[in-house]
């Protein structure tokens, strides 16, 4: 009896625990459904009309450009990149293709280093070669620093970042010494001051750039990042700078998007704080104010997906992809949404994820998402086999 009594007591406790677990799970499921309905109810009605792109079609292909670099086809790279830059000098709206093309080099891929150095050595008077290497070095600087808070980042990491930035600065200086009309080079200089300088340094770099090319969206959008509150600016400054830019909107319709940047940043802050409904509201306001800008849709699409509203999220991500193709973040979220259980388009999700890797190289979350998609594909294959279809 002395042995049986504790056993009986344990059985009673296990039943109690099991019952409690069932109750808690039921409550969580009910709360989840209730919260989902509540979140949906709080989101204002979203109306999506036909897209009105603010830029000409983006035709630069980052995958092809990266492949040409690996093949050391410097003549083809020179012809491709300078053709985009020449078009932008004749029509500032074409600077979007310049940004897209040179972004192909903005990845911390060790395999890029040697061919870029070789290209610069072979063609010291090529602004395209210098700018391509600058993009790479700035990406390496970000990789060296890492994404953690400054208090969690070592002095060695900061030193490596500074070394890459210094090397990149030399390449930008060389670029502008050969061709002072390259807006992408000015944007990198402004970004450098944003990270390592002050608000005043950032504005000085921006003013010098805008003196040369006042209708550039590339220059003005990078300046807007300097004016964000997290970098010592304010939303009032952002709105004022956006309003001033409208003087040139007849030359470059893309400048209209700047009017939505303050609300876009508000949305980003809400998104980062897990406040997805307010984020959606701010992103929607940004679209209403600034028009069809890819980042606005990408931000809103992410917020929708974090609320498990994947159909809405996918619609926004597809719009972002149409407006600005080959963006890694857009492709990643497309893969995530397409692989959601209720969507189940895992083959399509895998294609988007593969393109993201081709565009920007692998990254930690990509491996996790890939494993999930592959697992679901395998399960789907087993289910199909079991059903005899």
What are the roles of these predicted feature ranges?
Residues 244-247, 350, 355-389:
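Terminal, low-structured helical/coil segments at or just beyond the last alpha-helical repeat
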Residues 30-40:
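Hydrophobic single-pass membrane-insertion segments
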Residues 129, 182-185, 219, 255, ...:
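TPR alpha-solenoid repeat register
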Residues 9-21:
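N-terminal Sec-pathway targeting helices
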Residues 56, 60-68, 75, 82-125, ...:
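Short coil/linker segments at helix-helix boundaries
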């Amino acid at each position: 009896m002395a042995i049986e009594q504790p056993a009986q007591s344990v059985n009673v406790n296990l039943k109690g625990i099991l019952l409690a677990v069932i109750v808690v799970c039921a409550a969580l499921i009910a709360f989840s459904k209730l919260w989902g309905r509540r979140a949906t109810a709080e989101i204002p009605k979203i109306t999506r009309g036909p897209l009105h792109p603010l830029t000409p079609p983006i035709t630069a292909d980052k995958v092809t450009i990266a492949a040409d670099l690996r093949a050391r086809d410097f003549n083809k790279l020179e012809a491709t990149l300078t053709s985009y830059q020449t078009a932008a000098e004749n029509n500032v709206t074409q600077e979007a293709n310049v940004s897209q093309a040179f972004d192909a080099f903005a990845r911390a891929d060790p395999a890029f280093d040697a061919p870029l150095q070789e290209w610069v050595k072979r063609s010291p008077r090529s602004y395209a070669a210098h700018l391509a290497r600058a993009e790479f070095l700035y990406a390496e600087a970000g990789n060296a620093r890492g994404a953690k808070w400054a208090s969690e980042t070592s002095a060695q990491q900061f030193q490596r970042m500074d070394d890459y930035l210094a090397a990149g600065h030399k390449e930008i200086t060389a670029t502008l010494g050969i061709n002072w009309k390259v807006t992408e080079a000015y944007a990198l200089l402004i970004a450098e001051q944003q990270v390592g300088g002050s608000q005043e340094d950032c504005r000085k770099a921006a003013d010098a750039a805008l003196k040369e090319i006042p209708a550039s969206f590339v220059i003005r959008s990078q300046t807007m990042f300097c004016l964000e509150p997290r970098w010592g600016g304010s939303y009032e400054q952002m709105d004022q700078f956006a309003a001033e830019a409208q003087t040139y909107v007849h030359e470059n319709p893309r400048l209209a998007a700047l009017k939505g940047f303050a609300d876009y940043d508000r949305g980003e802050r809400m998104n980062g704080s897990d406040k997805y409904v307010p984020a959606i509201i701010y992103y929607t306001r940004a679209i209403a104010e600034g028009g069809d800008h890819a980042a606005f849709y990408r931000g809103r699409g992410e917020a929708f997906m974090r609320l498990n509203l994947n159909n809405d999220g996918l619609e926004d991500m597809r719009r972002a992809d149409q407006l600005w193709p080959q963006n890694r973040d857009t492709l990643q979220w497309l893969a995530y949404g397409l692989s959601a259980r209720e969507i189940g388009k895992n083959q399509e999700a895998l294609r988007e994820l593969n393109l993201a890797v081709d565009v920007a190289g692998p990254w930690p979350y990509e491996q996790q998402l890939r494993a999930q998609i592959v697992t679901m594909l395998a399960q789907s294959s087993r289910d199909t086999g079991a059903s005899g279809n």
